[in-house]
């Protein structure tokens, strides 16, 4: 989260689920919906989670404790990628990509995106 604040990243894209076939694939690095969690010098509040067909969009309010920086960050998580395979169709992935591009444009688009 410190990197997100330092680089002023507004969009995070995640293409994996935390668990697949009962195995841990990724560390969950965000708080549950409507909850706040502090990571070092950065406080993260999960404002909302919206489920779309094939992906989730989370909106976070980020606050840097020592630099008094606040910002809004969006995370898009594709949840239909099968373990050790490829999706049957790309329509949901393409739809998520369009949402990501739109979000980048709406948030200024000058900061790097985290994938």
Curated annotation (Swiss-Prot):
Catalytic activity: O-phospho-L-tyrosyl-[protein] + H2O = L-tyrosyl-[protein] + phosphate
Single GO MF descriptor: protein tyrosine phosphatase activity
Keywords linked to the UniProt accession: Hydrolase, Protein phosphatase
Superkingdom of origin: Eukaryota
CDD domains found in the cross-reference section: PTPc
Matches recorded under SUPFAM superfamilies: (Phosphotyrosine protein) phosphatases II
Domain Tyrosine-protein phosphatase: 1-115
Enzyme Commission number: 3.1.3.48
Residues reported to bind substrate: 83
InterPro entries: Prot-tyrosine_phosphatase-like, Protein-Tyr_Phosphatase, PTP_cat
PANTHER family the UniProt entry points to: PROTEIN-TYROSINE-PHOSPHATASE (PTHR19134:SF562), RECEPTOR-TYPE TYROSINE-PROTEIN PHOSPHATASE (PTHR19134)
Family listed: Belongs to the protein-tyrosine phosphatase family.
Name this polypeptide is given: Tyrosine-protein phosphatase 22
